[in-house]
Amino acid sequence: DMTIRCPHDFDERFLLERLSDLYPSTWRFSVDSLVGASPEMLIAAACGTASSRVLAGTCKPGEGQALASSAKDLREHALASESVSSILERLCLDVRTQGPFLLSLPNVTHLATDVRARLGSAHLLDLVAALHPTAAVCGTPRDAAMHLIEELEDTERGRYSGPVGWVDTAGNGEFAIALRCGLASGTRLRLFAGAGIMPDSDPDAELTETEAKMRPLLDALGV
């Protein structure tokens, strides 16, 4: 994480407007002082169809072909996408996946997979509860990964990487994963970012990736 201080209170409306201008292909949000531009849809529901976008595996812009052939990143992505599709297969009908494909953003390029299914009797909020936390933000197996995070991670995530979204009375809605975000508190803005760790991860490369993922908020601030 990173904390930025300003002489005046942060205006979340300004940050949201800037993120919408700079990162229009993401899901932007501002909820109770948490503002961000997430590229990853945990789960959405509309007209009886559920959809999710899974991201895992990241590189600098322009290096997508190397990413698409990286055994390490493809394995990381497979673990993340399988964690989502396997849960939807238990709770939904006719689960279909499309990917992995390259998703290009101004600051990074991701491996992405879209997952779609028929809702059946499942409610959107049931899917949110079952999917969170995904392997992309927690690890797998989930219980073992959560235990290690509690033991080793010295940063309090708060609402970072949690579900953020909306739902209506008909059960339609969208819940993104709260990524590329910051928590505003008066003159302080705490930025969050992270990277998936695999056995063959390079710590320096993961740090560089994490710094790149902070660019949306930094760009919004003009830093």
Which stretches of residues belong to each language-model region?
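An anion-binding catalytic pocket shared by soluble metabolic enzymes
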Residues: 3-79, 171-194
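Alpha/propeptide regions of enzymes that mature by internal proteolysis
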Residues: 1-4, 85-86
